[in-house]
């Protein structure tokens, strides 16, 4: 989920009031519902033909945590749209895996963490990449099994430019590094759910 300036989020509201509302938020979910939910629905109505979520494949327990894996066209908006649709179903928003190559300013790094994002390190050596993948896998398993918090992760690095939306092998290998048991047990532990985007942008 995301946020811009206070005139966009709360038009006509003085900054002092906006600041008080922000300080009143005690959790990341409260922050997202206060500042991001309405903005994202407003944006969706302006630039898409509509958003829908087929949640029938999910168990009835809305408090359960899942790993959502999908293609993406805009990593912030796609995961944000998923979150507001989940909120409408009475479910929690998702933590988002976001590459550090997108954190071009220090304030962006702080802001995405407020919005339940965790950082995926890029431009690493092979050894560093293996260590980072193992660390992230352990965190994702912990987030699903201990924090009971759902996660969204792109199925491949970058956008698919040739209509090839197959999940990158390295993503599945990363998920299987952490956790206990054999590879199948580890993948089942993160309760992964494959999604595919069908939004059509309005002209």
Model-predicted regions and their roles:
Residues 60-125, 129, 176-186:
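Catalytic core of membrane glycerolipid acyltransferases/transacylases, capturing the structured
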Residues 58, 100, 158-160:
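Conserved short loop/turn motifs at secondary-structure junctions
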Residues 67-69, 96-98, 152-155, 189-196:
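Extended hydrophobic secondary-structure segments that form protein cores and membrane-embedded regions
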Residues 94, 131-134, 138:
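Basic/hydrophobic alpha-helical interface regions
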Residues 1-6, 193-200:
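Conserved small/polar residues in nucleotide/adenosyl-binding loops
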Residues 136-188:
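Loop-centered beta-sheet repeat module
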Residues 123-130, 159-165:
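Flexible, glycine/proline-enriched loop segments at strand-loop-helix junctions
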Residues 1-66, 72-83, 87, 109, ...:
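Membrane-anchoring hydrophobic helices of lipid-metabolizing enzymes
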């Amino acid at each position: 989920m995301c946020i811009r300036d206070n005139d966009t989020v709360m038009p006509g509201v003085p900054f002092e009031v906006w600041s008080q509302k922000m300080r009143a938020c005690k959790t990341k979910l409260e922050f997202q519902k206060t500042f991001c939910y309405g903005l994202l629905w407003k944006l969706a109505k302006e630039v898409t033909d509509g958003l829908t979520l087929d949640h029938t494949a999910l168990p009835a327990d809305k408090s359960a945590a899942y790993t959502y894996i999908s293609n993406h066209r805009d990593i912030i908006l796609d995961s944000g749209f998923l979150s507001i649709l989940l909120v409408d179903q009475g479910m929690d928003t998702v933590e988002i895996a976001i590459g550090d190559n997108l954190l071009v300013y220090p304030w962006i790094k702080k802001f995405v963490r407020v919005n339940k994002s965790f950082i995926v390190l890029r431009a690493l050596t092979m050894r560093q990449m293996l260590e980072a993948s193992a660390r992230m896998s352990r965190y994702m398993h912990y987030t699903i099994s201990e924090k009971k918090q759902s996660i969204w992760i792109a199925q491949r690095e970058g956008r698919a430019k040739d209509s090839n939306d197959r999940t990158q092998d390295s993503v599945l290998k990363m998920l299987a590094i952490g956790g206990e048991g054999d590879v199948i047990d580890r993948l089942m532990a993160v309760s992964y759910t494959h999604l595919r985007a069908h939004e059509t942008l309005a002209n």
